[in-house]
Regions:
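Long extracytoplasmic/lumenal interhelical loops at the membrane interface
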Residues: 294-361, 373, 377-380
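Transmembrane alpha-helices of multi-pass inner-membrane enzymes
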Residues: 55-63, 386-395, 404-438
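A juxtamembrane structural motif centered on a specific transmembrane helix
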Residues: 1-29, 65-68, 288-291, 415-438
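A membrane-periplasm/extracellular boundary helix in multi-pass inner-membrane enzymes
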Residues: 143-155, 264-303
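Hydrophobic transmembrane alpha-helices and their immediate junctions
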Residues: 229-233, 240, 257-261, 265, ...
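Alpha-helical transmembrane segments of multi-pass inner-membrane proteins
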Residues: 38, 131-156, 166-247, 253-266
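N-terminal hydrophobic segments of proteins, predominantly signal-anchor/transmembrane helices
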Residues: 30-42, 56-119, 143-144, 379, ...
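Membrane-interface helix-loop-helix junctions at transmembrane boundaries of multi-pass membrane enzymes
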Residues: 17, 21-28, 60-75, 218-235, ...
């Protein structure tokens, strides 16, 4: 019997979407490169610029889009970005323009990531792919942490460092950005201790990244894979706790503790698999602290409050600087007054950075946008509920850590994916086909 011509036409029609899907998948190639190839960026000395570099193809895609959707409340963030530009007029030295440009480029790259993910089709960016990206960077973070524990004095000259002009490469700020080191060796406990920092510029960046990525690995994968694949994440989590504890990042542990308590209080939202993952995590931490020398190390850190007075001084001076220029700030962190051994005012927490650099108005806009994200992610389904938890972590971390690199981009990435998932579900429910079927 002869084939129906209608059936004959279906074969090429089915092939066309597959070819189209392959073309669309290429649009996210730079994010694949960033998350799965982050160690390469680190070796090349480009890790501090990875987000900006990978945002360029994403921006190109957005520019070519006929329509770019923007979620409600995004105007607050755009106003914050505009206020940042006004603050550049307050810079007191031309050299400060380098730091300002670097920080502003990170704000812009996070914005591009958010808009790209929010507008990407489901076939291109399913939740599984977003969570896989975060898991890959988390594994890299843990591996770098172990490198810092095992070889604390390790480091090497990066590819970028080799080609930079010597005058630029010797600049301390540039050195921090382009020279890979395994750990920051400090002696505040009375003996040298390597606090992991690889593959980031500072140990605080390592702690901030670990705190923001761990909930995604635990909760995101718990929802996607159920109980079948929980053994591997739990084994990796067990291994990660050693460099996490050795890092002595109190802000990291505070953030994770708040996340754990908050998620437990919202257990109905996070789901049964996530509750099991959270409980297993808590048990692992307690056991490690109780039966290994890591418990003694954590106790020594708690007993040694060496940094409390320094941070109090920096926070007090941040408020003082903000009072001198309450509207536009100073455009950049400022030199500390008095104790010259302390880092610049505005470098020990995102909120203090914004306050000193962009004044009370900038700080208000920044916090307002985080609260907008908190509101908009509060009632997400279990599969994307981790987005809300990341906003909570960011609200805690902003007082102690710089969020410009990994934390901002991960929060924007996961929140954008969650809000896009929520929007698609709402569109599906309100579509004529769905209504007619009902």
């Amino acid at each position: 019997m002869a084939r129906s011509p209608v059936l004959d036409r279906r074969a090429p029609a089915a092939a066309a979407p597959r070819r189209s899907r392959r073309r669309r998948l290429r649009l996210g190639w730079s994010l694949d490169l960033l998350f799965f190839g982050y160690p390469l960026f680190w070796v090349l000395g480009l890790h501090s610029f990875a987000w900006q570099l990978c945002a360029v193809p994403l921006l190109g895609h957005l520019v070519l889009q006929r329509r770019v959707r923007v979620p409600r409340g995004m105007g607050v963030w755009f106003t914050f970005l505009a206020w940042n530009l006004l603050s550049v007029t307050q810079l007191q030295r031309s050299a400060q323009l380098i730091g300002f440009s670097y920080r502003y480029s990170l704000y812009l790259s996070a914005t591009v990531v958010f808009l790209f993910v929010y507008n990407a089709p489901t076939a291109l960016l399913p939740l599984r792919r977003v969570y896989s990206w975060c898991a890959a960077l988390w594994i890299t973070t843990v591996a770098g942490g172990w490198l810092g524990v095992m070889v604390p004095n390790g480091g090497f000259t990066s590819g970028l460092e080799r080609v930079l002009p010597s005058r630029l490469a010797e600049d301390l700020f540039v050195q921090d950005l382009v020279h890979p080191s395994f750990a920051q060796v400090q002696q505040f406990l009375g003996y040298p201790l390597g606090r992991p920092q690889a593959p980031f510029a500072y140990t605080n960046h390592w702690g901030a990244a670990f705190a923001i990525l761990t909930p995604v690995v635990l909760l995101g994968w718990a929802h996607l894979n159920g109980s079948r694949y929980q053994l591997a994440p739990q084994l990796l989590l067990t291994a990660s706790l050693v460099p996490a504890i050795v890092s002595l990042n109190r802000g990291m542990f505070l953030s994770l503790l708040v996340a754990l308590v908050y998620a437990s209080a919202r257990s109905g939202r996070v789901g049964a698999n996530a509750r099991r993952a959270l409980l297993a995590t808590l048990v692992l931490v307690v056991v490690l602290l109780a039966v290994t020398p890591l418990g003694n190390l954590a106790q020594e850190r708690n007993d040694n409050q060496h940094s409390n007075s320094g941070r109090a001084t920096l926070y007090g001076q941040a408020l003082d600087y903000a009072g001198r220029s309450p509207f536009l700030g100073f455009g950049a962190p400022q030199e500390v007054e008095g104790d010259l051994l302390l880092p610049p005012v505005g470098t020990q927490g995102q909120i203090w950075l914004v306050l000193v650099s962009h004044g009370y108005v900038g700080a208000l806009l920044y916090v307002a946008f985080l609260l907008v994200l908190f509101r908009d992610t509060r009632r997400l389904p279990a599969r994307t509920s981790v987005a809300h938890l990341l906003v909570v972590v960011a609200l805690v971390e902003m007082f102690v850590y710089d969020l410009l690199t990994v934390p901002h981009h991960i929060v924007f990435l996961v929140v954008a994916a969650a809000l896009a998932d929520k929007r698609r579900a709402a569109d599906l429910e309100s579509s004529p086909t769905t209504s007619g079927a009902a």
